[in-house]
Amino acid sequence: VIQALQDLDWQGNGKTVSVRINSIDTHYMYRDVIEVVEQAGEHLDTILLPKAGTASDVYMLSALLNQIETSTGLKKHIGIEILIETTLGMANVMDIAKSGREERLEAMHFGVADYAASCRARTTVIGGLNPDYPGDQWHADLSQMLVACRAYGLRAIDGPFGDFKDPESYTLAAKRAAALGYEGKWAIHPSHCLLYTSDAAD
Protein backbone atom coordinates (compact mmCIF):
# COMPACT_ATOMS: atom_id res chain seq x y z
CA VAL A 1 0.00 0.00 0.00
CA ILE A 2 2.75 2.44 0.96
CA GLN A 3 4.73 1.76 -2.20
CA ALA A 4 1.62 2.15 -4.34
CA LEU A 5 0.86 5.51 -2.70
CA GLN A 6 4.42 6.67 -3.30
CA ASP A 7 4.82 5.41 -6.87
CA LEU A 8 1.46 6.01 -8.55
CA ASP A 9 -0.47 9.21 -9.23
CA TRP A 10 -3.74 8.33 -7.51
CA GLN A 11 -4.73 11.98 -7.07
CA GLY A 12 -4.97 12.81 -10.77
CA ASN A 13 -8.19 14.42 -11.99
CA GLY A 14 -9.14 15.52 -8.48
CA LYS A 15 -9.56 12.05 -6.98
CA THR A 16 -9.67 11.59 -3.21
CA VAL A 17 -7.13 9.04 -1.99
CA SER A 18 -8.18 7.04 1.07
CA VAL A 19 -6.70 3.99 2.78
CA ARG A 20 -8.87 1.58 4.77
CA ILE A 21 -7.17 0.54 7.98
CA ASN A 22 -8.04 -2.25 10.39
CA SER A 23 -10.71 -1.52 12.97
CA ILE A 24 -9.98 -0.21 16.45
CA ASP A 25 -10.87 -3.55 18.05
CA THR A 26 -7.80 -5.17 16.45
CA HIS A 27 -4.13 -4.87 17.42
CA TYR A 28 -3.23 -3.88 13.85
CA MET A 29 -4.98 -0.52 13.76
CA TYR A 30 -2.38 1.77 15.32
CA ARG A 31 0.49 0.34 13.24
CA ASP A 32 -1.60 0.75 10.09
CA VAL A 33 -2.02 4.45 10.79
CA ILE A 34 1.55 5.11 11.88
CA GLU A 35 3.21 3.31 8.98
CA VAL A 36 0.94 4.63 6.23
CA VAL A 37 0.83 8.25 7.41
CA GLU A 38 4.50 8.54 8.39
CA GLN A 39 5.72 7.04 5.11
CA ALA A 40 3.11 8.24 2.62
CA GLY A 41 1.00 10.88 4.34
CA GLU A 42 1.70 13.51 1.71
CA HIS A 43 -0.04 11.29 -0.87
CA LEU A 44 -3.07 10.61 1.31
CA ASP A 45 -6.32 12.56 1.71
CA THR A 46 -8.26 10.47 4.23
CA ILE A 47 -8.14 7.38 6.41
CA LEU A 48 -11.17 5.06 6.24
CA LEU A 49 -12.01 3.59 9.65
CA PRO A 50 -14.16 0.42 9.54
CA LYS A 51 -16.72 -0.62 12.15
CA ALA A 52 -16.93 2.77 13.86
CA GLY A 53 -19.21 2.23 16.83
CA THR A 54 -18.96 5.35 18.98
CA ALA A 55 -17.74 8.92 18.77
CA SER A 56 -14.70 7.93 20.83
CA ASP A 57 -13.51 5.71 17.97
CA VAL A 58 -13.24 8.76 15.73
CA TYR A 59 -11.59 10.76 18.51
CA MET A 60 -8.94 8.07 18.99
CA LEU A 61 -8.00 8.05 15.32
CA SER A 62 -8.01 11.85 15.18
CA ALA A 63 -5.72 12.07 18.23
CA LEU A 64 -3.29 9.61 16.65
CA LEU A 65 -3.25 11.61 13.41
CA ASN A 66 -2.63 14.82 15.38
CA GLN A 67 0.41 13.26 17.03
CA ILE A 68 1.84 11.86 13.79
CA GLU A 69 1.40 15.13 11.90
CA THR A 70 3.05 17.09 14.71
CA SER A 71 5.89 14.59 15.13
CA THR A 72 6.73 14.35 11.43
CA GLY A 73 6.01 17.97 10.50
CA LEU A 74 3.47 16.84 7.93
CA LYS A 75 1.72 19.96 6.69
CA LYS A 76 -1.14 18.08 5.06
CA HIS A 77 -4.25 17.68 7.23
CA ILE A 78 -5.53 14.14 6.76
CA GLY A 79 -9.27 13.64 7.07
CA ILE A 80 -11.27 10.72 8.41
CA GLU A 81 -14.02 8.70 6.77
CA ILE A 82 -15.84 5.92 8.60
CA LEU A 83 -17.81 2.80 7.85
CA ILE A 84 -21.09 2.37 9.68
CA GLU A 85 -21.40 -1.41 9.61
CA THR A 86 -22.59 -2.49 13.05
CA THR A 87 -25.79 -1.99 14.98
CA LEU A 88 -23.77 -0.11 17.60
CA GLY A 89 -22.54 2.32 14.97
CA MET A 90 -26.04 2.86 13.61
CA ALA A 91 -27.45 3.36 17.11
CA ASN A 92 -24.83 6.08 17.68
CA VAL A 93 -24.73 7.50 14.17
CA MET A 94 -26.08 10.95 15.08
CA ASP A 95 -23.68 11.35 18.00
CA ILE A 96 -20.76 10.20 15.84
CA ALA A 97 -21.66 12.72 13.15
CA LYS A 98 -22.12 15.55 15.64
CA SER A 99 -18.86 15.11 17.55
CA GLY A 100 -16.85 13.71 14.65
CA ARG A 101 -17.17 16.88 12.60
CA GLU A 102 -14.77 18.49 15.06
CA GLU A 103 -12.38 15.53 14.80
CA ARG A 104 -11.56 15.52 11.06
CA LEU A 105 -14.62 13.46 10.08
CA GLU A 106 -15.61 14.10 6.46
CA ALA A 107 -17.79 11.20 5.31
CA MET A 108 -19.75 8.13 6.35
CA HIS A 109 -20.04 4.93 4.30
CA PHE A 110 -22.74 2.30 4.77
CA GLY A 111 -21.05 -1.10 5.13
CA VAL A 112 -24.00 -3.28 4.29
CA ALA A 113 -22.34 -6.71 4.45
CA ASP A 114 -21.09 -6.57 8.04
CA TYR A 115 -24.14 -4.53 9.01
CA ALA A 116 -26.40 -7.33 7.80
CA ALA A 117 -24.42 -9.78 9.92
CA SER A 118 -24.64 -7.46 12.92
CA CYS A 119 -28.43 -7.32 12.48
CA ARG A 120 -28.64 -11.09 11.88
CA ALA A 121 -30.51 -10.19 8.74
CA ARG A 122 -31.23 -12.68 5.99
CA THR A 123 -29.74 -11.52 2.72
CA THR A 124 -29.29 -13.03 -0.72
CA VAL A 125 -26.87 -10.55 -2.33
CA ILE A 126 -24.61 -8.04 -0.57
CA GLY A 127 -26.34 -4.69 -1.01
CA GLY A 128 -29.17 -6.19 -3.05
CA LEU A 129 -32.87 -6.67 -2.53
CA ASN A 130 -34.30 -9.66 -0.68
CA PRO A 131 -37.33 -11.26 -2.36
CA ASP A 132 -38.72 -12.12 1.09
CA TYR A 133 -38.80 -8.46 2.13
CA PRO A 134 -41.20 -5.97 0.52
CA GLY A 135 -39.13 -3.07 -0.78
CA ASP A 136 -35.56 -2.25 0.23
CA GLN A 137 -34.69 -3.80 3.60
CA TRP A 138 -31.91 -1.21 4.14
CA HIS A 139 -34.02 1.87 3.42
CA ALA A 140 -34.52 2.87 7.07
CA ASP A 141 -30.82 2.47 7.88
CA LEU A 142 -29.69 4.37 4.81
CA SER A 143 -32.12 7.17 5.65
CA GLN A 144 -30.97 7.34 9.27
CA MET A 145 -27.32 7.63 8.27
CA LEU A 146 -28.13 10.18 5.58
CA VAL A 147 -29.95 12.44 8.06
CA ALA A 148 -26.94 12.35 10.39
CA CYS A 149 -24.60 13.26 7.54
CA ARG A 150 -26.75 16.08 6.23
CA ALA A 151 -27.35 17.51 9.71
CA TYR A 152 -23.61 17.87 10.33
CA GLY A 153 -22.16 18.53 6.90
CA LEU A 154 -20.72 15.10 6.09
CA ARG A 155 -20.71 13.22 2.79
CA ALA A 156 -22.93 10.13 2.65
CA ILE A 157 -21.64 7.19 0.59
CA ASP A 158 -23.49 3.94 -0.07
CA GLY A 159 -21.51 0.70 0.20
CA PRO A 160 -20.89 -2.32 -2.02
CA PHE A 161 -23.06 -4.45 -4.26
CA GLY A 162 -21.81 -8.02 -4.34
CA ASP A 163 -23.17 -9.62 -7.51
CA PHE A 164 -20.68 -8.68 -10.25
CA LYS A 165 -22.77 -10.56 -12.83
CA ASP A 166 -25.88 -8.42 -12.32
CA PRO A 167 -25.06 -4.94 -13.65
CA GLU A 168 -28.71 -3.92 -13.82
CA SER A 169 -29.25 -4.48 -10.10
CA TYR A 170 -26.06 -2.58 -9.28
CA THR A 171 -27.28 0.35 -11.34
CA LEU A 172 -30.69 0.28 -9.67
CA ALA A 173 -29.07 0.19 -6.21
CA ALA A 174 -26.93 3.19 -7.10
CA LYS A 175 -29.97 5.08 -8.34
CA ARG A 176 -31.93 4.27 -5.17
CA ALA A 177 -29.09 5.65 -3.07
CA ALA A 178 -28.86 8.77 -5.23
CA ALA A 179 -32.61 9.30 -4.95
CA LEU A 180 -32.26 9.32 -1.15
CA GLY A 181 -29.50 11.91 -1.34
CA TYR A 182 -26.32 9.83 -1.28
CA GLU A 183 -23.30 11.32 -3.03
CA GLY A 184 -21.68 8.10 -4.15
CA LYS A 185 -21.64 4.31 -4.12
CA TRP A 186 -18.81 1.84 -3.86
CA ALA A 187 -17.47 0.23 -7.03
CA ILE A 188 -15.68 -2.98 -6.00
CA HIS A 189 -15.31 -4.54 -9.45
CA PRO A 190 -13.96 -3.10 -12.73
CA SER A 191 -17.39 -3.49 -14.33
CA HIS A 192 -18.90 -1.36 -11.57
CA CYS A 193 -16.53 1.50 -12.37
CA LEU A 194 -17.85 1.77 -15.93
CA LEU A 195 -21.46 1.49 -14.79
CA TYR A 196 -21.01 4.04 -12.03
CA THR A 197 -19.32 6.69 -14.14
CA SER A 198 -21.94 6.40 -16.88
CA ASP A 199 -24.91 6.46 -14.50
CA ALA A 200 -23.48 9.21 -12.28
CA ALA A 201 -23.87 11.60 -15.17
CA ASP A 202 -27.62 10.86 -15.39
Indicate where each model-derived feature is located.
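Expand to "…catalyze enediolate/carbanion chemistry for C-C bond making/breaking, isomerization
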Residues: 1-198
